[in-house]
């Protein structure tokens, strides 16, 4: 009798678990798209068929579709902390299996003109240093690396999308350097170039890259050049950042067709 009672209790529990599972809707894989500023995501949000908006950590995560693809678009705010939190939330709360970071950047290489677009080969944090305790400049302790590589298939799709969307603009592939600073002095720029090389600098990409690396999630960073990172084009930054961000966003829209 006791065994029968235990069996019935276990059976009831199992049925309850199964019924609870049937009531849950599985979250479909999505592509996460991150921009730091409103100008960097406004076109994407206008184009998307937004189904739902959820606020987490002061950020609005907009779930919808673009070109038949499930996407989650979010303005994360400036800086590496915001960007890292945002990427991790997209991956773990919204089941994003790919992450795209779009926006503007300052050039580090003289061959880049304002308006040109950079697609990341990898990303580094130019302001991260623990050399005093034996690590290389920029190296993230206990990860064995300082540069986080972008996904090759996403890079290819991004380059093709730029070439097809804005064919009169040059597209480059290379390193993106990130730090919690707006680089506007020649000395700052030269230090970054000396330490890490790179094609452009901004404030979010490498944090997103590290979060994706830790979560084993493919990513790519796409940045349009808005200034020269040396203070010589401060007026141009305000004038062209909107256009540059828009060209980047248009390229992302085309890229989604290829993913």
List the predicted regions and their residue ranges.
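Bacterial N-terminal signal peptides
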Residues: 9-18
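Glycine-rich phosphate- or other oxyanion-binding loops that anchor nucleotides, phosphorylated ligands
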Residues: 28-31, 54-259
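Bacterial N-terminal signal peptides that target proteins for export
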Residues: 1-9
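Short, conserved "active-site rim" segments that organize catalytic pockets and cofactor/ligand binding
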Residues: 28-48, 70
């Amino acid at each position: 009798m006791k065994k029968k009672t235990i069996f019935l209790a276990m059976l009831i529990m199992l049925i309850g678990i199964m019924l609870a599972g049937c009531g849950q809707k599985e979250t479909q894989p999505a592509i996460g798209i991150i921009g730091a500023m409103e100008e960097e995501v406004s076109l994407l949000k206008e184009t998307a068929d937004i189904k739902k908006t959820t606020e987490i950590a002061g950020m609005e995560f907009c779930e919808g579709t673009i070109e038949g693809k499930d996407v989650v678009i979010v303005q994360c705010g400036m800086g590496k902390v915001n960007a890292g939190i945002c990427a991790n939330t997209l991956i773990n709360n919204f089941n994003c299996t790919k992450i795209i970071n779009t926006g503007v950047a300052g050039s580090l290489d003289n061959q880049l003109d304002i308006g040109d677009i950079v697609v990341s080969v990898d990303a580094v944090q130019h302001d991260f240093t623990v050399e005093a305790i034996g690590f290389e400049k920029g190296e993230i302790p206990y990860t064995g690396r300082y540069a986080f590589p972008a996904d090759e298939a996403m890079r290819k799709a991004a380059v093709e999308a730029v070439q097809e969307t804005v064919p009169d603009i040059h597209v480059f592939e290379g390193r993106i350097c990130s730090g919690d600073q707006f680089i506007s002095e020649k000395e700052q720029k030269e230090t970054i170039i000396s330490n890490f090389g790179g094609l452009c600098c901004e404030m979010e990409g490498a944090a997103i890259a590290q979060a994706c690396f830790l979560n084993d999630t493919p990513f790519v960073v796409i940045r349009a050049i808005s200034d020269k990172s040396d203070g010589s084009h401060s007026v141009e930054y305000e004038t062209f950042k909107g256009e540059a961000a828009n060209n980047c966003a248009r390229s992302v829209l085309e890229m989604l067709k290829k993913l």
